């Protein structure tokens, strides 16, 4: 198991953000998180990390929660876009608006970027990913890894309907082998 640390968007930064001592993370952090994971995989592949371990580096599963889940989606092949961020972040009366939008809307200037997919990632477990504004529903076919998305019905930060259920409506992602687990509570 590799557990990356993401300076600039780690637990200390989140604590400072919630206390009002810091602004949301720099939009560039949206790109840095998946690149951090790919760099760790490169280190294992090059033999500079976990030396002497037998690791199938070409068959990797990633797991992420919240923003880490967003990074896992990027590593799995979804590409971020500012299309919805540009219009919906300005609408304070949007009925789907939720607390996760604070983070998603802070990514506006960093959203349009090249794919950060890592071909070594074959599966992803993503828990409560803020994704409704950040990814287009049409980007599902670009997923190269199988994704298990887990969301809770009482998650008030990243609510399941707008952030998990709505992006998967239409059946295409589910028809391609991806799965949604909607936990009651």
Predicted features and spans:
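Conserved alpha/beta-hydrolase
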Residues: 1-13
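Alpha/beta-hydrolase active-site loop
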Residues: 22-57, 74, 84-102, 110
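Residue in the alpha/beta-hydrolase core beta-strand immediately N-terminal to the catalytic nucleophile
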Residues: 59-61, 123-125
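Gly/Ala-rich beta-loop-alpha elbow adjacent to hydrolase catalytic centers
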Residues: 64-68, 72
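Acidic beta-to-alpha connecting loop that harbors the catalytic carboxylate
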Residues: 67, 130-131, 153-156, 184-185
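Conserved alpha/beta-hydrolase "acid-adjacent" motif
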Residues: 135, 156-163
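Short beta-strand/loop motif that positions the catalytic acidic residue
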Residues: 143, 149-151
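Catalytic histidine neighborhood in serine/cysteine hydrolases
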Residues: 171-185
